[in-house]
């Protein structure tokens, strides 16, 4: 008598299921951080920060594990699909916050960071593709250099944006005759400005190197720079940050002016990352 053995799930299928489950668990933990941000904004005072910090920290660990399993599943750096890009951005935003918090202990930064982390990860879940087809042009070692540099730069510039926003809120509160209670929780103007500047000092070189490696990649593939919306907006955003660096170092800009320009720069980052996807071109996420 022949006994038929039922084969179990394929290893790739198990890995794919695990990485999705881990990402959803991370999303659930990030929601605790998101709830903290909403409650703090509504109550105008710190609400459940420590549980939110623990949840987001645990979520980040699960998120990284999910990205590693995704890479094992698809066998390339998972940054070419919308699902992968949003997931990676969310993870790096979490990393940026955790590093900034470890150095500065600025709890109010969470009010700005946690919503972005949650939203990016939530959107990633909406675009999940179990069997992506990577274009041949992306099967290049440049993918492992150009794209992480850009995303790391984006994460650092997000922290600069959050610090600049805190600066403006704190400045307004100090001048107000009836400041809200939340202002007492904010760091000093000097700390906000210092965090914004140091984050800019990290983010600007990263996106500069990212743009340079992207140009070299385009030269190797097409012989010219790719002419698409993302290239244009990346360059315009880079110019904004170049002006910010210039005015800080040469003209001595500090405080409000630098904060406003930092916010304008990050709006450019969001337009580059989100908006230009609808214009087509080599950088369009599938």
What kind of feature is each model-predicted range?
Residues 19-133, 145-173, 189-221, 227-286:
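Hydrophobic cores of alpha-helical transmembrane segments in multi-pass integral membrane proteins
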Residues 5-6:
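Low-complexity, intrinsically disordered or signal/transmembrane-proximal segments
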Residues 134-142:
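Active-site-proximal inter-transmembrane loops
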Residues 174-190:
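Juxtamembrane inter-helical linkers in multi-pass membrane proteins
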